[in-house]
Amino acid sequence: MKTNTHSCQQPSQQQPCASAQQPSCSQPGQQPCASGHQLCVIGLGYVGLPLARLFSTKYKTIGFDRNHNRVAEIMSGHDSTMELDERLLKEAIEKNGFLCTSELEKIKECNIYIVAVPTPVDENNRPDLTPLIGASRTVGQVISPGDIVIYESTVYPGVTEEECIPIIEAESGLTYNKDFYAGYSPERINPGDKEHTVEKIKKVTSGSTPQVAEIVDNLYNSVLINGTHKAPSIRVAEASKIIENSQRDVNIAFMNELAKIFNAMGIDTRDVLEAASSKWNFIKMSPGLVGGHCISVDPYYLIQKAQVYGVLPRIMTSARRLNDGMGAYVAEQTIKCMNKKGVLVKDSRILILGITFKENCPDTRNTKVLDIYHTLSEYTRNITIYDPWANPDSVAREYGLTITPALPELAAAREGAVCELPAAGAAEAAASEVAAGCAAAGAGAGSSGELPAACPAAAAGKYDAIILAVAHNQFKDLNYKALLAPNGIIYDVKGFLPREIVDARL
């Protein structure tokens, strides 16, 4: 029972309070209050933290996360996901009174709980609702009559009311749509996207009753620049999110299939797409690896639910299978390029640029770059993964791989050496060129004329193959000439580099 009581009246048919004074309804059968919100956002990752910060600009907001280290990091003003501008985070803490905690006692006074936890799949690609179940139990331990719980996690239609609500009822002893209420507003965060930030994203909203739907819609509208779309039901809102990502997965699978066809025919796929996109209604997308915690995961939620209803979703299933095989395909195409140039694949030295699931983002969840690595590791163990965005400790912990956050050779790359490479097929890396690279790096030759041991270009001409797997901005300015061995090849997954310096691209 909350101590800061709402000004709402007791009859079960009453309207939501219109007063902004001290809101907290606390009687069984209580109607939801429409004002004076005190919010708790449960789950402070890529989605939850930016959302909590945004709400703190208008409402008293507390962030809750079971990870004590994450809470401490945030309260120190740091966000390791790099999703939230730390200036905004510090402002929220210092000026808005934004608080993060792992203590249940500190969130009991809230009257709106927003759940933003991951919804992954297991090793068999079946929906894993463990984080969602845990968060629902947390809500059940603190929720009071009149409160509202809003879910943002991506799920198949029915999860909120069929899986989550019964847990809250069991934990709290309260009755759904009599004592407490629910809403669903699916997250639309695009990790690493600094243009479409949370306040600029139009949100779908919904509620368990028309009255609650209005409260939830007004809540989000109060902080969003581009407003909301109020769905007619929670199930409709759930379905809308799951098809957003499933549609994108299917479209990318089509592009990947085209890439395989055109590569076999010796036609550049991106040239084809550029030409086709000259028609006004052609939907231009690009082939590539599909990883991360959304597009490569969410379709499995709908696939499983469809099968429960006796429907076999053939297109989505085929798209998932095709996209999941693209890492191995890239590795095989790289090997093919090496063979064509007479480069021995066995024990060759290969550099993979990027391990995160997308560009300019530290998120490595479900990255398909691993499939490139594992396929190539059947032929050579001399594989280096370089990613200036990824956390080496996180990668080691999650995947058992050692990556490097820096390459010694890169110190030789300076402005003016962007993508400097001999024409495709050239097979020499003269010592004078290496020395020039050292001079550009500010390291002169010793009195003997030999390169000093500390010269960053001393290891130039190192890799037999370079695979640009992730289009981080930093990779645009690398000195590829200094990195590539004589007759080495470059494979560009993203079509990111100048065509004249690459041997093949997806």
Per-region residue spans from a language model:
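Proteins enriched for Cys/Gly/acidic motifs involved in redox and nucleic-acid/cofactor modification
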Residues: A441-A443
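Structural/interface elements that position substrates and couple domains in central-metabolism enzymes
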Residues: K2-P11, C17, C25, P32-G425, ...
